[in-house]
Amino acid sequence: MAKFELYAEVDVSISGHQYPIIICRNGLIDPELINRFITSKQVLIVTNRTVAPLYLGHLQSVLPSKQCDVVILEDGEEHKNQRSLFTIYDSLIQNKHHRDTSIIALGGGVIGDMAGFAASTYQRGVRFIQLPTTLLAQVDASVGGKTAINHPAGKNMIGSFYQPQAVIIDLNTLKTLPEREFRAGIAEMIKYALLVGGSFFERIQEALQQGLTVHSPELPLLIAECCQVKAKIVEQDERESGLRALLNLGHTFAHALETYTDYKKWLHGEAVAIGLYCAAVLSEKKGLLDKPIVDQVEKMLIHAGLPHKIPNSIDLIQLRELMSLDKKIKNNCLRFVMIKKPGACYIDDSVTEDCLHNALINVVEGERK
């Protein structure tokens, strides 16, 4: 059996609940590691049709003494819905899982969100372990305890905050990740670079210029740093009453774009990439951000092979209406994460309709001045 290799361990402490984020190789097939967090006799593995043929058998092999049931869902954001959620509940009930059961999320952010929401609500809460298999889930979606399903009216409209027992990031799973999915995950890394600034921004920028890949030697520690950044923020503000809202940089635009296209045009990270560029242009239009920094953001997204412009086929008025459903609205005011410079972001609820419209026009393909 391949030897377990540890790169980093990030400890998270939220509301008296502590758990580790373990960045490693061969963790998914290490019996000692997996069973350290699965103390129950019952386990439900939630995965999808893409990941199951690759890793399900390996995970099952390290749980030979457990009642190990499996739910295999359809792959994709469009399936993050009530129907999929109830498929998980049905399996738990039909297989007589008790309150001491454990749910394992084996997959990307969609699987983690749904399995986590099921864990937070089944019999008022059962143990939950994250095994993220996409870069986006490893650096962002699996960290911090947000769980949700989508509603036809908008993304992540029904959800909860629920922390896992552990997040085990096995970097070997990235070897089978499609190139497009890997690049989508880089968008969240760029987001962290903008939030943190300083040397981390420079390292991400340099890594992208050199061509960041699954095999880049700096990747494990960059992933660990992203996890550390998010963990530190979430520890201070678990339920997004203030500081944590900064993690939504670019997401007001991204969620509206995803809803507009029924989750069929872009991966989540690709929509975030467009959202980051929108946020940078909006910050420039409000007189906060210098244009050379906007150009830097654009170059980073281009180096990452990510989209950054809004297609001219999209109705900006309808897109603005979808933004009005955003969960971050407070006191009926739409709030944006604005950028003064890398490392200096803040929440702004005073963006005028004219300023927003002007920014959006300048982000449409072929329209940037």
From Swiss-Prot:
Belongs to the sugar phosphate cyclases superfamily. Dehydroquinate synthase family. One of its GO terms (molecular function) is 3-dehydroquinate synthase activity. It comes from Legionella pneumophila subsp. pneumophila (strain Philadelphia 1 / ATCC 33152 / DSM 7513). It comes from the Bacteria. It is found in: Cytoplasm. Binds 1 divalent metal cation per subunit. Can use either Co(2+) or Zn(2+). This is 3-dehydroquinate synthase. One of its GO terms (biological process) is amino acid biosynthetic process. InterPro entries: Dehydroquinate_synthase, DHQ_synth_AroB, DHQ_synth_fam, DHQS/DOIS_N, DHQS_C. PANTHER family: 3-DEHYDROQUINATE SYNTHASE (PTHR43622), 3-DEHYDROQUINATE SYNTHASE, CHLOROPLASTIC (PTHR43622:SF7). Zn(2+) binds at E188, H251, H268. Pathway: Metabolic intermediate biosynthesis; chorismate biosynthesis; chorismate from D-erythrose 4-phosphate and phosphoenolpyruvate: step 2/7. Catalyzes the conversion of 3-deoxy-D-arabino-heptulosonate 7-phosphate (DAHP) to dehydroquinate (DHQ). It catalyses: 7-phospho-2-dehydro-3-deoxy-D-arabino-heptonate = 3-dehydroquinate + phosphate. Its EC number is 4.2.3.4. NAD(+) binds at residues 75-80, 109-113, 133-134, 146, 155, 173-176. The keyword ATP-binding does not apply. Keywords: Amino-acid biosynthesis, Aromatic amino acid biosynthesis, Cobalt, Cytoplasm, Lyase, Metal-binding, NAD, Nucleotide-binding, Zinc. GO terms for cellular component: cytoplasm. Its cofactor is Co(2+); Zn(2+); NAD(+).
